[in-house]
Amino acid sequence: MLKTILVGATGYTGAELAHYITKHPELELAGLYVSEHSLDAGKPFSSLYGHLLGVVDQTIEPLAVSNIKNICDDVDIVVLATAHEVSHDIAAEFLAQDTVVFDLSGAFRVNDPAFYENYYGFKHNFDKELQSAVYGLAEWASADIAEANLIAVPGCYPTASLSALKPLAKHGLISTDQKPIINAVSGVSGAGRKASLASAFCEVSHAPYGVFNHRHQPEISTHLGHEVIFTPHLGSFKRGILATINVKLAAGVTPEQVTAAYQEAYQDQPMVRLLPSGWPSIKAVEKTAYCDLAWQQQGQDLIVVSAIDNLLKGAAAQAMQCINIRFGFAMTTSLV
């Protein structure tokens, strides 16, 4: 079995990852780590997440950077569910110990150092690792993921958006005259587990944020190969993302071409479901690892709707897909 440690274990995504790793027949959960000053250190994991009582009861351990070499003894896989700056600082330390690193932060998603100063507010100091990192959009990068030692798991909004748009871009069906317009709403869990007034029960209201300056906009544009307009919204529900995307198609594109593009892209991809009728909903994907897609065309105008669970297909489940790809396991292992 492959020994796997999880760093940043106590966030919402960390909890989902701990459960997936524990269920995986080829992985051994060898350690759950938090920052060395975290108040969660020393607690049983299931004391934070009661639904995992009897499933993940390991003690949460503090991680000191100076101790990384010691904790990596015989470790094969490191999963980082840490803040962007933390992943930036420690990923190279784990790579130096001959582990394969799966990073769920944004620290290695775009191979351009300037991107991080502009959108994350820090200078990227690990150009070698940045250039070698593979963007882990599972259905679209399996060959590269299988050879990589640093996999940057995509963001939740980019996963929903790129899954909807990449089949069109691959076949040149998107008009160059108009940017795709993405309006997406996410559950409050996307803001993380730390308490804040903005995500408090009595304060949350469906509203846009990050207009024209959200860091996921350039991430989407970079990996799509088309500029987009992206407006995220905070919804008054726990989990899930619903993205409604308006696309101007290239002149002469037929409904048959659009359908063929999606079918070609996803006919052998078990975690993406093309709906035969109706529209994607958060209810249908909540607490699942699926991405649901549907579309409708009127002339050159196409509306595509994508739904995922932000904590799963938008984070933990996609990380597990990448682990499965990297080590040659079936794509759905531990996920369904």
Curated annotation (Swiss-Prot):
Molecular function terms in GO for this entry?
A: N-acetyl-gamma-glutamyl-phosphate reductase activity; NAD binding; NADP+ binding
Give GO terms for biological process.
L-arginine biosynthetic process
Q: Which reaction does it catalyse?
A: N-acetyl-L-glutamate 5-semialdehyde + phosphate + NADP(+) = N-acetyl-L-glutamyl 5-phosphate + NADPH + H(+)
Q: Which residues form the active site?
A: 156
Main localisation, per the record? Answer: cytoplasm
What metabolic or biological pathway is this protein involved in? Amino-acid biosynthesis; L-arginine biosynthesis; N(2)-acetyl-L-ornithine from L-glutamate: step 3/4
Localization in the cell: Cytoplasm
Q: What keywords are assigned to this protein?
A: Amino-acid biosynthesis, Arginine biosynthesis, Cytoplasm, NADP, Oxidoreductase
Give start-end ranges for the coiled-coil region(s): none
Q: Pfam families from the entry? A: Semialdhyde_dh, Semialdhyde_dhC_1
Report the EC code(s) recorded for this entry.
1.2.1.38
Q: Which SUPFAM superfamilies does this entry report, sorted A to Z?
A: Glyceraldehyde-3-phosphate dehydrogenase-like, C-terminal domain, NAD(P)-binding Rossmann-fold domains
Q: Which domain of life is it from?
A: Bacteria
Q: Which residues form the signal peptide?
A: none
What is this enzyme's class at the first EC digit?
oxidoreductase
- One term under GO cellular component: cytoplasm
Described function: Catalyzes the NADPH-dependent reduction of N-acetyl-5-glutamyl phosphate to yield N-acetyl-L-glutamate 5-semialdehyde.
Q: Which HAMAP family match?
A: ArgC_type1
Report the sequence similarity comment from the record: Belongs to the NAGSA dehydrogenase family. Type 1 subfamily.
Q: PANTHER family under this entry?
A: N-ACETYL-GAMMA-GLUTAMYL-PHOSPHATE REDUCTASE, CHLOROPLASTIC-RELATED (PTHR32338:SF10), N-ACETYL-GAMMA-GLUTAMYL-PHOSPHATE REDUCTASE, CHLOROPLASTIC-RELATED-RELATED (PTHR32338)
This one is known as N-acetyl-gamma-glutamyl-phosphate reductase
- Please name the gene that encodes this protein: argC
